[in-house]
């Protein structure tokens, strides 16, 4: 994936190739401590030929980082909180609906805007594939409801979008 910047294009790797400071994250998580790490737009780092950290021209994708971290720390759930209440099927049309649940098969038949929802969907898909746990996309103001499955969209390996619908967003 490439991202346009004034005067040039730079790469946004789908998954960072190297996981730095993994123990710095997993030990506090194991101790049930809230850890805030990762994020988008930061300095992209990889390993040089000698195994040392080296900066590269790239964009750090926050959704991909969240998915990678969730898999790395063996998270039971991945929640991507955003400014929309749920995934919208048929986004941008009068038929737009927020499915409460989607399966990986459902996702493969759907298309999402490249710069907004697509990275979130792909990150959830990767997490569910790697862990067989559920992921969710929903409003920043409703993390507890998203976790409980009463708001937002839950993505699982075998859930069925026709099982439930939330009220229109």
Where are the regions that the model predicts?
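C-terminal catalytic "cap/lid" subdomain
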Residues: 1-169
């Amino acid at each position: 994936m490439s991202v346009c910047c004034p005067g040039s294009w730079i790469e946004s790797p789908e998954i960072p190739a190297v996981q730095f400071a993994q123990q710095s994250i997993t030990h506090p998580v194991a101790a049930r401590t809230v850890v805030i790490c990762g994020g988008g737009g930061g300095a992209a780092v990889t390993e040089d030929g000698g195994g040392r950290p080296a900066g590269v021209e790239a964009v750090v994708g926050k959704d991909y980082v969240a998915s990678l971290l969730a898999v790395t720390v063996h998270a039971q759930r991945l929640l991507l909180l955003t400014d929309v209440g749920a995934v919208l099927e048929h986004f941008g049309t009068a038929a737009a609906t927020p499915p409460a649940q989607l399966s990986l098969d459902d996702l493969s038949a759907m298309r999402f805007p490249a710069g907004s929802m697509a990275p979130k969907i792909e990150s959830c898909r990767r997490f569910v594939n790697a862990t067989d746990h559920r992921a969710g996309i929903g409003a920043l103001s409703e993390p507890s409801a998203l976790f409980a499955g009463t708001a937002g969209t839950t993505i699982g390996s075998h859930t069925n979008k026709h099982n439930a619908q939330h009220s229109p967003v």
